[in-house]
Amino acid sequence: RIAASGSPDALQLIRDVMLASASIPAAFPPVMFDVEANGKRYDELHVDGGATSVMYLYPIGLDWGKLSKHLEVKGKPNVFIIRNGIWRKHWESVERSTIPIALRSMDSLMGSAVLGDAYRIYLATQRDGINYNLAYIPESFNEESSEPFDKEYMAKLFNLGFQMAKDGYTWHTVPPGYDVGSK
C-alpha cells in the first residue's frame, strides 16, 4: 500500500519502516513515526520487527491463488529465506544470576520464534503451491562472537557465506526438524 500510494513520502516511509524493523532495543534507537488516528495526531516509537514476527512472508489468511491470478503470476513462485543464524543452539552453562538467566531465556525464546516462523512460512508455501528455499549457517561454523557487532566474527561469517554461494549452495526445501513424512 505504501509503495502504491503515490505519496512523495512513500520511499522515505518504507526506509523508516525497514530501519525500525531492524532497530534492536538498546543497540539502536527506535524510529519515530507521526501518525493520525480519529483526527488526532500521535507520535509512535517503533523497534525490532522480530518482537512480533522474526520472519514474515504474507498474512496467513491471504488468498494467494486469487492474488496470483490477479497479478497474472506465471509458473510456480519461489520463496528464498536467508537465516543469519544457526538453528540449533548448543547447550550452554549459565551463571546462577538473574541477568544471565534472562539473557539465555530470551535467546531460547528467539530461537523458538525463528523455528516457528520457518514452519508457518513452510506450511503456507505448501498450501499455496510456492517453492520453499531456506539457507542458514551450518552447525560446522563454530566461531564465537566476542562482542555485539564483532567485526572479525562478521568477516568470518561473510567469508563462509561467500564461499558457500560460490560452491553452489544447496537450498533446504523444508525447515530443520520438519518431518515431511507426517503430513
Predicted segment positions?
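Patatin-like phospholipase
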Residues: 1-183
